[in-house]
Structures are given as C-alpha cells and as structure tokens.
Amino acid sequence: MKAGQQGRSCGLISPYLAPKNQSERFAFIAEWYDPNASLLRRYELLYYPVDGSVEMHDVKNRRTFLKRTKYEDLRVEDLFIGNKVNVFSRQLVLIDYGDQYTARQLGSRKEKTLALIKPDAVSKAGEIIEMINKSGFTITKLRMMTLSRKEAADFHVDHHSRPFYNELIQFITSGPVIAMEILRDDAICEWKRLLGPANSGIARSEAPGSVRALFGTDGIRNAAHGSDTFESAAREMELFFPSSGGCGPANTAKFTNCTCCIIKPHAISEGMLGKILIAIRDACFEISAIQMFNMDRANVEEFYEVYKGVVSEYNDMVTELYSGPCVAIEIQQSNPTKTFREFCGPSDPEIARHLRPETLRANFGKTKVQNAVHCTDLPEDGLLEVQYFFKILDN
C-alpha cells in the first residue's frame, strides 16, 4: 500500500466475511522443519473455505502428501504470509502465496501496523485488546517493554521540534508500554479510527466509544498510539520488533516473587486474551511482564518435560502449546504460585465449573488440554518458568 492510501474508504467487504464460493480454494507455499532428517521441507498447502478442508503436496517430490481432509483448527484468518499454522501436528510457516488468485484475495489489502499502549493505559490493556479483537484485528506480536530516552527519541523523531517534545519523552519513558503488531484489511486506517482523535478531550466529544475517549486524559496522556502511514508503521515496528533478530527495547520481567501464566493458543485464537487479562487484573494480580511467543515442538517438550510420563494428556498438551501463538505472563503477588494456581482452578474445566466456578479455567476452558491457561504448579518452579520465557526464549 502506498503512503497516501491510508485514508481510503474502509467499507469494502473483506474476503473473510464474503459468502463462501463452493469451488474456492486458497494456495500457499509452506515450509516445515523435519527434526528427524534435519531438513526444511516445502509443501503446497491448499485450503478450501467451503468446508474447512486442507490438502498438501510435496513440492520437491511432486506428489500428494495429504489428501483433502477436513481440518477444523485452521481458519481463513490464519492464512497470511509469515504466520505459523499447525496442520495435524506439523508446524508450517507460510512463506509465499501459491497462486495469483490467493495473492489477490488475501494479500492485496492486508496490512500490519503498530498499536502501542502507553504507560497511562497499561492497566487497561485487557479492555483495549478486547476492543482490538472485536474490531477484526489479529494480534501477531505483543510485548511489554520499557523505553530508554534514546529509544523514545527514535520513536518520537517526527516530534523533535514540537514544544511538547520533552513532555512526550518524559511520559513515554515513565513506565512500561505494550507494543503490538496488529493485522487486518486497512489496518492503519481502521486502528486510527478505533483510537479516535489524538486529544482525549476532543475524542470524548467526537468519538466517545474510541480508545482515547475511554482511557486517555489529554493530548499527551492519550492511552495509545497508532502509525499514520505505511512508511511510519514499518519504521516504528522495526524499533519495537527488529527484523534483524534483535530483541528491541528491554522486557519488563522482574524475576522476583513471581509465577508463570501461559494463555494457550486456543484461547488466543478464540479471542479470549483481553477477557483473561481483565480477569487476572480484577483478581488483584500484578502483570509485570507479558509477551506473545510462537513456540516450536522442541521448546514445548523442554518446557513440559516435568509432565512427561506423569500426565496422560502430555502429548496433547505439547501439540496444543505449539499449535499457534501463546502469551506468557509474569505474575506477581505475595505467595504468587499458590494463590495464582488456586485462581486458575482445577485443570479439568468441567470439574472447575462445578467446584470453582469463579476460576479462569471454569470461565474460559473447554477441555483438560484446552483449559485456557497453564500455571506453575510448584513454588520452586515459578522463577524457572518465568526465566524460560523472558530470559531464554526472549533472547
């Protein structure tokens, strides 16, 4: 998209909302790392929206790898370049479109932009994420971080000559921020619309349901930021999520008096992230660090190693955790592991709904495997699990 296109009409019908064509199919080129052969294998992945079925072909050997089969865990919304999708326990990376039709239908208007929750609204992150999800965005990256003065200056380089520049820098470095990469058709235009006018006072008059009207205070403390153009979105996302493989600004993990929570992929996919964050906050737990991760099978097996041979659902637990993005959280409170484990409830949501109906798993879980959240079981493991995500995987 060219820089001048962000103001165009946002009323066109998305291919995700259009009636399903009986013969329509989308084609992608996907890669899968085969750990046994230490090879990167390439496939053509075909997806049929009419019945949610998939088909795969081995590109190198020119043969069918998977005949057309119904697969309910893949949606059209998951199909975009760079995403990782799980198809029958294989984690595939979508690297290119397989034909021009797919590129036109799914790629021509798909945009990414930066959504930044500022220090004054971090406590309302759950509500803002809920608004983002309900507005049709997909969150593809998320990380709580703190900005140094230099990082803040790089971010606000366009405001360097403005009279409020120093106040802007002081505010953005006054506490943690939450940076997100969000995706949808016309993302830049639609996120700016959801944000509302830059001054929160004006937003309350002109766009009372907007993010800045609901959670901002004035023109500086205005809850959240959105990129203005395609070019500024690319520049700003590079600051927070470097494509070179660097970590960007420092995460906010404290590694003291903490326990670990992981919001599982099924809950992310079903749009529960915001609601779960609100529930955690309202139960008086401090969310001191949060980040989205796309784990591979080896990482998940390493993390869940203590459950191997002990829990009968171990293999299904592993498959669930690497089936899509998960969100890891450092939780702080007095005696955090015990109190947070009690708040999560029994691992089986059905039992939780009978015995502990106020718990996270009772409210957001589906099955013993898809039970919304993982939490640390033993007090001595709380710090270790937090370190695994925010020190080892983050680096």
UniProtKB/Swiss-Prot annotation:
Disruption phenotype: Knockdown of nme7 in embryos is semi-lethal, the majority of pups died prior to weaning. The most prominent phenotypes in surviving mice are hydrocephalus, situs inversus totalis, postnatal growth retardation, and sterility of both sexes.
Key word Transferase present: yes
One MF annotation (Gene Ontology) recorded for this entry: ATP binding
Subcellular location: Cytoplasm, Cytoskeleton, Microtubule organizing center, Centrosome; Nucleus; Cytoplasm; Cytoplasm, Cytoskeleton, Spindle
A single GO BP: CTP biosynthetic process
Keywords noted in UniProt: Cell projection, Cilium, Cytoplasm, Cytoskeleton, Flagellum, Hydrolase, Kinase, Nucleus, Transferase
Superkingdom: Eukaryota
Tissue-specific expression: Widely expressed. Expressed in the flagellum of epididymal sperm but not in testicular sperm (at protein level).
SMART domains named among the record's database cross-references: DM10, NDK
Documented EC number(s): 3.1.-.-, 2.7.-.-
Keyword Kinase: yes
PANTHER family from the UniProt entry: NUCLEOSIDE DIPHOSPHATE KINASE 7
Domain notes: Contains 2 putative kinase domains (111-243 and 258-391 AA), the first one is involved in autophosphorylation and the other may be inactive.
Protein name, per record: Nucleoside diphosphate kinase homolog 7
Organism this protein belongs to: Rattus norvegicus
